[in-house]
């Protein structure tokens, strides 16, 4: 029996899936990934994500938000537009939002303002926050902590931070999203060293597909050799398998815990 899985972060609207999106979904479901949260990073994508979920209501939901890379691009009425999007039942979280001081595609002060506004929106709409934190030097936690009493929930997406970062997030009661980064014995070693600090009842798993293909993934099937570097939601089980090995538990334990956590945080029903 295949364990049922929830991919809480898949960029299913990426152009990399344009030629075979339906087949990607079919492969995911065949692999037990029957619930997917589509990550959206700006207003246009959030609108498209909402439309996709309405057209495909069984097992699909999305986020709505502005990624820190796009903070510089928001217009005067961006928050009003996002507020309307966030009200839709298909939208299960505000985000992807946060801070990225690694690349600074948007000026830090704009990132901070746009992130802060979305935290207020999450509190006002009762939606959890889907958080991006890269090299923020504690600023993401500082803002989250400022709003913490009003936020219904937080997941730190694609966590690759430090031991101290993890301790702070866990002490605050946040969920932690783990991707195929943990499957990389070289780049992911620091994460491997600390990941089991995450209690199973705070663990969420995600592919971040089409990015971060797990290093323990099998070779693509015949006909998909040209996608050998592309990640897919069907490979979420590779993340669960690596985590099960690190925790010293069964694959089913990781699958069940992450499924229940996703249900709790995002108010997800079982698929029909």
Where are these regions (language model features)?
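Mid-domain alpha/beta scaffold segments of enzyme catalytic cores
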Residues: 1-272
């Amino acid at each position: 029996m295949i364990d049922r899985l929830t991919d809480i972060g898949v960029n299913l609207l990426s152009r990399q899936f344009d030629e075979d999106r339906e087949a990607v979904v079919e492969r995911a479901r065949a692999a037990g990934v029957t619930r997917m949260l589509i990550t959206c990073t700006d207003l246009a994508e959030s609108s498209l994500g909402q439309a996709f979920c309405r057209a495909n209501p069984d097992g699909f939901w999305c986020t709505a938000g502005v990624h820190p890379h796009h903070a510089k691009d928001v217009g005067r009425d961006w928050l009003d537009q996002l507020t309307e999007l966030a009200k839709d039942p298909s939208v299960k979280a505000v985000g992807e939002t946060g801070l990225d001081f690694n690349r600074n595609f948007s000026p830090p002060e704009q990132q901070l303002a746009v992130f802060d506004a979305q935290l207020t929106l999450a509190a006002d709409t009762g939606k959890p926050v889907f958080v991006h934190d890269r090299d923020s030097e504690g600023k993401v936690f500082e803002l989250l902590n400022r709003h913490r009493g009003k936020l219904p929930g937080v997941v730190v997406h694609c966590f690759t931070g430090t031991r101290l970062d993890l301790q702070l997030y866990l002490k605050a009661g946040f969920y932690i999203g783990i991707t195929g980064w943990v499957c990389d014995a070289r780049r992911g070693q620091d994460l491997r060293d600390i990941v089991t600090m995450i209690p199973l009842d705070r663990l969420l798993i995600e592919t971040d597909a089409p990015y971060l293909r797990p290093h323990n993934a099998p070779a693509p099937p015949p006909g998909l050799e040209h996608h050998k570097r592309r990640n897919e939601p069907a490979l979420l089980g590779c993340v669960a398998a690596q985590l099960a090995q690190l925790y010293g538990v069964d694959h089913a334990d990781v699958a069940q815990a992450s499924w229940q956590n996703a249900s709790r945080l995002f108010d997800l029903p079982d698929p029909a």
